Design a protein with these regions (language model features):
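Conserved anion/nucleotide-ligand pocket segment
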Residues: 163-224, 229
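General beta-strand structural signal in soluble alpha/beta enzymes
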Residues: 91-94, 121-123, 146-150, 173-176, ...
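ATP-dependent carboxylate/acyl-activation modules
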Residues: 286-337
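Conserved active-site and cofactor/substrate-binding residues in soluble primary-metabolism enzymes
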Residues: 9, 13, 17, 37, ...
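Rossmann-fold NAD(P)-binding glycine/threonine-rich loop
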Residues: 98-115, 123-163
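Substrate-binding/catalytic subdomain of NAD(P)-dependent oxidoreductase enzymes
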Residues: 200-294
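N-terminal glycine-/serine-/threonine-rich beta1-alpha1-beta2 phosphate-ribose binding loop
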Residues: 1-115
Length: 337
């Protein structure tokens, strides 16, 4: 059995979810494929838990739940960049929150990992949206994998699906709902005739919306994901600044009621060909009319025609599903070497 070591950078919601799923699926999935996957380091902003033989996942999750990571026996003062460089590992999971203005600290983490000969899997949208060509080019130069399925659509396997099964197609357009928070709010407003603020407050109480929901409400999150899809699937060379973005702040109960009378709903839609994110009228019987936190993404292709993917676009377990799918993809390539 081949031993493979991971470094987890960023131990927030996605990091914890990834370790929970890894613990759950290790024996059933990974070991059956011939891999003993160990976590060699878990890096947080002020230090790291490091054990070259493999960290006990239960102990790390328990320490995190009680806010006592620093009391873990394997705690070190090594910051993430240092840990990426010195810890013996095969794959770095870059799971930190993204800053769309700078892309940091994700860009530095990804570059350091690739420069040190480590494959990378990331859920961090900002580096992939801002430095797609640079980072994928560096990975190719180093003969390494950079995987980022978890940056778009939660558990929806859109990037890997295209790469593994649909690459014979020319994708003519990508169009869809890419943000579960805004979709939940619009669904709530439409179905229960409540204001945006009322729907937003409930979303925050349920943990669907962040305390500062601006990235979701103003369309930034959708635009970032749109850029990633455009570059990775359609071969475009665009950045966030190329997208015209308008969010849902001005949507009222009156506008939704008017749409309803004419057989429409209003959804926040990302449109690659239009280079735009904006609220749009969608017929009630249209495939994009999905409710709650669901995402729906339509690909129009020259051979396969139109394909619509629907699924949960957020959540720690759903995103962890995509993170570990990318890990397994890398493991399969390592197995063939």
């Amino acid at each position: 059995m081949k031993t493979v070591k991971l470094i987890v950078v960023g131990f927030g919601t996605i990091g914890k979810g990834t370790l929970e799923v890894l613990r759950m699926k290790h024996r059933d999935l990974l070991e059956k494929q011939g891999f003993d996957v160990r976590v060699a380091a878990v890096c947080e902003i002020d230090g790291s838990i490091v054990n070259d033989k493999g960290i006990n996942i239960d102990s790390v999750l328990k320490a995190a739940s009680s806010g006592k990571l620093k009391e873990h026996p394997d705690w070190k003062n090594a910051k993430s960049l240092e840990a990426i460089e010195v810890v013996d590992a095969d794959i770095v999971l870059e799971l930190t929150p993204g800053d769309i203005k700078t892309g940091e600290p994700g860009i530095s983490h990804i570059k350091k990992a690739l420069e040190c000969g480590k494959h990378v899997v990331t859920s961090n949208k900002a580096p992939i949206a801002l430095r797609f060509q640079e980072l994928t080019g560096l990975a190719k130069k180093k003969g390494l994998k950079l995987r980022y399925e978890a940056t778009v659509g939660g558990a929806i396997p859109i990037i890997n699906l295209y790469r593994d099964n649909l690459e014979v197609n020319e994708v003519r357009s990508i169009y869809g709902i890419l943000n579960g928070t805004s979709n939940y709010i619009l669904t709530k407003m439409f179905e229960e005739d409540v204001s945006l603020q009322t729907a937003l407050k409930e979303a925050q109480e349920l943990g669907i919306a962040e305390r500062d929901p601006s990235y979701d409400i103003d369309g930034t999150d959708t635009a970032v994901k749109l850029v990633i899809l455009a570059n990775s699937i359609m071969g475009k060379r665009i950045s966030y600044k190329d997208i015209n973005v308008r969010g849902i702040q001005e949507i009222t109960t009156e506008s939704l009621e008017l749409a309803k009378k004419h057989g429409y709903v209003i959804k926040l839609v990302g449109d690659v060909n239009g280079m735009e994110v904006s609220p749009r009228l969608i017929p009630v019987n249209h495939p994009l009319n999905v409710s709650g936190t669901l995402n729906a993404i339509m690909l129009d292709m020259d051979i396969a025609g139109t394909l619509t993917l629907v699924g949960h676009g957020a959540g720690k377990i759903q995103t962890a599903s995509s993170v570990l799918a990318d890990v397994i993809d890398i493991l399969k390539d390592m197995k063939e070497l």
